[in-house]
Amino acid sequence: MSALEWYAHKSLGDGIFWIQERFYESGNRANIWLVRGSEQDVVIDTGLGLRSLPEYLYSSGLLQDCGSKEDAGRRPLLAVATHVHFDHSGGLYQFDQVAVHRAEAEALARGDNFETVTWLSDSEVVRAPSPGWRARQFRVQAVQPTLILQDGDVINLGDRQLTVMHMPGHSRGSICLHDKDRKVLFSGDVVYDGSLIDWLPYSRISDYVGTCERLIELVDRGLVEKVLPGHFNTFGAERLFRLASNYISKAGICHKVSTFAMRSLASLALRVTNPRTSP
């Protein structure tokens, strides 16, 4: 299967494109965002990486190919992972320039499929990307980041800037990217319009509460009007406020106890399926 078949996209205007993996039918299917700038383009999350995402970007005309991969005339392209979970980081190995938060840089560099929570089944991939492909073969490949991100860093695209916000809770290195001028928030799995996951091995409820308080502050200060999340559909500031507030309100003792049990089961399952890379 070609990259042009595997991916599909639509334009949201203002140089932003929403890309998805057509034949990965799962709640884990991540949104891939392309943000075009005057001096640099940025891909936010890369999906599973079962077909070449860079090939799709150029073959579909989303980006202009000025020649060979080494051609200095090509505008720089940076792949940013909002976190290293497999559904977001699987395609990072296809890019020359890769950025991730420092808290998860080591896990990515060693291909730690325990921390990437790799969990994929044949039933979720409704058309095999290549003959004989099986989900049990899938692993997130080790990638050495070329850019280590911290809270407050700014990624300069020329005519727009994306500010890094370290937002742990879902994972220890989760980030949002905030376009302050346009009041757009690329939220990864920090927040999306669904049940927020805080029961994975490196999730932490106390961190998530602090993150949600930051999200509420963004809304209160009028700094976000549109959220482009890691899963499902986009939404606005009012929904962002409600999602963050609801999480804080439920994060009591009962939730912590049930989450502890779920985290224990998830960790056990991941250690069985990813024995070589679990700590």
Swiss-Prot record:
Catalytic activity reported: hexadecanoyl-CoA + H2O = hexadecanoate + CoA + H(+); dodecanoyl-CoA + H2O = dodecanoate + CoA + H(+); tetradecanoyl-CoA + H2O = tetradecanoate + CoA + H(+); octadecanoyl-CoA + H2O = octadecanoate + CoA + H(+)
Entry EC no(s): 3.1.2.2, 3.5.2.6
Gene Ontology cellular-component terms listed: endoplasmic reticulum membrane; plasma membrane
The keyword Secreted appears for this protein: no
Main location: endoplasmic reticulum
Annotated binding of Zn(2+) 2, by residue: D87, H88, D189, H231
GO biological process, one term: fatty acid metabolic process
MF terms in GO: beta-lactamase activity; long-chain fatty acyl-CoA hydrolase activity; metal ion binding
Protein name: Acyl-coenzyme A thioesterase MBLAC2
Source organism (scientific name): Mus musculus (Mouse)
Gene: Mblac2
